[in-house]
Regions:
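Minor-groove-contacting beta-hairpin "wing" of winged helix-turn-helix DNA-binding domains
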Residues: 262-266
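Extended hydrophobic-aromatic, low-complexity segments
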Residues: 228-229, 241-242, 258
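Short amphipathic alpha-helical interaction segments
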Residues: 237-251
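Short, amphipathic alpha-helical interaction segments positioned at domain boundaries
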Residues: 268-285
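A short, conserved structural fragment
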Residues: 251-261
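Solvent-exposed, charged/polar functional surfaces in cytosolic regulatory/catalytic domains
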Residues: 128, 132, 249, 253, ...
């Protein structure tokens, strides 16, 4: 939810429902950068929202942050991290600002109105985040996610571990291990179809190559990494051998490590996880 959406009524309603976590998109506590993102809320709204949720009895709160803004310094980012820690929330997620094609931000960069943050700076910001949150007692359990003991996101973890899930409502996605389904995103049409007794959705059947690549991409995001024993059971010993062959150069350069039956990213590999995953996902193509 957005921090400015959290009032007493919202908090009381959520507390009365079987909701086990509330996640808020704080993004930053810097007023200029909030305006840059065109966010409605202020930095103080985040603290007020956490307080309202706590008073309503919500004991599991997550806050999302962003870093790598144009002209952002290490000192700016450190202040955001410290402010987030002062909230005392159970879970934190942090993502580097991305310039996605077709977005206003992408257009601003292309027109020279903003400059993308230097990669060495964003790398340093990432490791500052990791070090500071781990020192504060948070488990770094996924590339971008941190949790106090016993407070991992079970919802997102089901995606990363390949557990089947069902999505309910317009635009909701589902997965059963062999296919992905998604409901149409047009709410009025969705409601009318449901009234007619029909759930309007599309479906994508996954072949072994796609399922294999999903396993690589999702499992590597977790600190536990890829369970090679599970890979062998699902895709055969040849798939494991090919995966290990492709992994060899990353093991030599210290980006991946093999620990027992698990292939996992090292601390150095976490920041370049997307590159490593893309190399390993060529298996089965």
């Amino acid at each position: 939810c957005n921090p400015d959406d959290v009032d007493d009524t919202f908090s009381e309603v959520v507390a009365a429902l079987p909701v086990n976590r509330v996640s808020m998109g704080a993004q930053t506590f810097n007023a200029d950068r909030l305006r840059f993102l065109r966010r409605r809320h202020s930095a103080s709204d985040v603290a007020k929202a956490v307080d309202k949720l706590r008073r309503a009895g919500i004991g599991n709160i997550s806050v999302d942050l962003m870093y790598g803004f144009p002209e952002e310094t290490m000192e700016d980012w450190e202040r955001d991290i410290e402010t987030a820690l002062q909230l005392g929330v159970e879970h934190l997620s942090a993502y580097c600002l991305m310039y996605e094609e077709g977005t206003p931000l992408f257009k601003m960069r292309e027109e020279g109105r903003v400059a993308e943050a230097d990669e060495e700076l964003t790398r340093a910001m990432y490791y500052l985040l990791v070090d500071r949150l781990e020192a504060a007692g948070y488990e770094h359990y996924e590339v971008s996610n941190f949790a106090l003991e016993g407070r991992r996101s079970l919802h997102n973890s089901s995606y990363w571990t390949g557990i089947p899930y069902m999505g309910i409502g317009a635009a909701a996605h589902s997965y059963n291990g062999k296919s992905r389904q998604w409901n149409i995103d047009n709410l009025p049409i969705y409601i009318n179809k449901v009234k007619e007794g029909v759930v309007p959705f599309e479906k994508e059947l996954l072949d072994d190559s796609e399922r294999h690549n999903d396993m690589v991409m999702l499992a590597l995001r977790r600190r536990e990494g890829i369970d090679l024993s599970r890979m062998a059971l699902e895709f055969g010993a040849a798939a494991v051998e090919e995966c290990l062959s492709l992994s060899r150069k990353f093991v030599k350069t210290g980006l991946l490590s093999i620990e027992g039956s698990h292939l996992r990213l090292t601390r150095e590999g976490l920041y370049v996880s997307d590159m490593v995953m893309s190399e390993l996902m060529s298996v089965g193509d």
